[in-house]
Amino acid sequence: MDELERQLNAIGFKTNQIPEHKILVIEDYTIEAGPHASKTVRVGLSAGDFPYTPPAGIHVSPKLRPDGQNNINASPLGNEWQYWSRRLPDWGKDRSARHIIAHVNRFF
């Protein structure tokens, strides 16, 4: 988790750790495009064994879409969060925070 936090901080993101869930939260993430463009959210990434295993999806707060649709479900982080299950392709070729952020940018 510390290495992912170091990489995200190096590219300008403010982060917080939730160690009991092995989640690294990007604070004040601004959505760049799509129906939620310009909204600011928190994005949680599973980071327990980064860079060996990619995040299986993201945790988002506040909720942007209804739970139970498009692989979006309740998050263990609390009622204001939701979990978006999304596969991160090409992890074997690029195991970096930049690769994760490029992938997250396509979600919204």
Model regions and ranges:
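Domain-scale recognition of soluble eukaryotic interaction modules
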Residues: D2-E3, P54-F108
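Strand-helix-loop interaction patch of compact alpha/beta domains
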Residues: M1-K39
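Residue-level recognition of conserved beta-strand positions in structured domain cores
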Residues: D28, L45, G57-H59
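Hydrophobic/aromatic-rich, well-ordered segments within soluble, folded domains that form packed cores
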Residues: H36-P51
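Short, charged/polar surface micro-motifs in flexible loops or helix N-caps
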Residues: I31-E32, G48-T53, K63-R65
